[in-house]
């Protein structure tokens, strides 16, 4: 039986965390830099604990104004401080509630930059490995960040996106483009099933791109987030695919 993990970005102040944590199997917990607060983190951790959901850190650039989606070029020392600050805070809050942090998934611009920039990818992976070599690194399927995680000796989680379109090189269509998002739930469900069952996704030019779907990212914000997550989970189960971290 095929198996896939469902993840979503939480503790970003969007208000749907409690409901989503009854549907997903991995929670990417924002670390109060690009969005959210300590109260949001503690609440998300409590809901995750209630539902047996795997916990990961979701650190981003310190860019609240743009939700961590603006590219930055930090020095290695500044990036190390930025990540250690966030990982350390979440790890402490996890331990305070008797929980373990299992993986790291960078947020927004950091995630996308590291997917294409090997030097940045190596730096991020090295910082995570230095912080705790037992942590896994979640990154875009086929990305340089995924390769860097393996090279650093980390376990990796290959991620695909339910509601984002893909470029022919396997990267995500930039959010600045009008075709970045998948238009309908039906199209997103078809894309998810294709990625999980066939290991392929249709790019914007019609070509098929190979992907490894260990985990599917679902949108965690907006009023439709919970309904969308319910549909994706139901369709996976109906197709005989186990949903588990």
Curated annotation (Swiss-Prot):
Q: Which UniProt keywords apply?
A: ATP-binding, Hydrolase, Nucleotide-binding
Q: Does the keyword tRNA-binding apply?
A: no
Q: Name one GO biological process term.
A: carbohydrate metabolic process
Lineage top rank: taxon: Bacteria
Uppermost EC category:
hydrolase
Question: What's an example of a GO molecular-function annotation for this chain?
Answer: 5-oxoprolinase (ATP-hydrolyzing) activity
Checking InterPro entries in the record gives: Glyco_hydro/deAcase_b/a-brl, LamB/YcsF/PxpA-like
Which EC number(s) are documented for this chain? Answer: 3.5.2.9
Summarizing the function annotation, the protein's role is: Catalyzes the cleavage of 5-oxoproline to form L-glutamate coupled to the hydrolysis of ATP to ADP and inorganic phosphate.
Family statement: Belongs to the LamB/PxpA family.
The subunit structure is: Forms a complex composed of PxpA, PxpB and PxpC.
Q: What is this protein called?
A: 5-oxoprolinase subunit A
Which organism does this record belong to? Answer: Neisseria meningitidis serogroup C (strain 053442)
Taxonomy, top ranks, is: Bacteria, Pseudomonadati, Pseudomonadota, Betaproteobacteria, Neisseriales
């Amino acid at each position: 039986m095929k198996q896939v993990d469902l993840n979503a970005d939480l503790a970003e102040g969007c208000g749907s965390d409690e409901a989503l944590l009854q549907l997903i199997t991995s929670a990417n917990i924002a670390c109060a830099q690009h969005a959210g607060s300590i109260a949001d983190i503690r609440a998300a951790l409590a809901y995750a604990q209630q539902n047996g959901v795997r916990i990961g850190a979701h650190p981003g650039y310190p860019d609240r104004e743009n939700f961590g989606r603006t590219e930055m070029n930090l020095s290695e020392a500044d990036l190390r401080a930025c990540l250690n600050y966030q990982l350390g805070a979440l790890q402490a809050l996890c331990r305070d509630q008797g929980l373990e942090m299992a993986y790291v998934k960078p947020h927004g611009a950091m995630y996308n930059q590291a997917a294409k920039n090997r030097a940045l990818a190596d730096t991020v992976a090295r910082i995570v490995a230095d912080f705790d070599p037992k942590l896994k690194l979640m990154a875009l399927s086929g990305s340089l960040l995924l390769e860097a995680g393996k090279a650093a000796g980390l376990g990796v989680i290959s991620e695909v996106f339910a509601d984002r379109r893909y470029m022919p090189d396997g990267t995500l269509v930039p959010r600045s483009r009008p075709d970045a998002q998948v238009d309908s739930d039906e199209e997103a469900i078809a894309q998810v099933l294709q990625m999980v069952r066939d290991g392929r996704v249709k790019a914007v030019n019609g070509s098929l791109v190979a992907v490894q779907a260990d985990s599917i990212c679902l949108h965690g914000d907006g009023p439709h987030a919970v309904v969308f997550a319910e549909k994706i989970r139901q369709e996976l189960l109906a197709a005989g695919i186990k949903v588990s971290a």
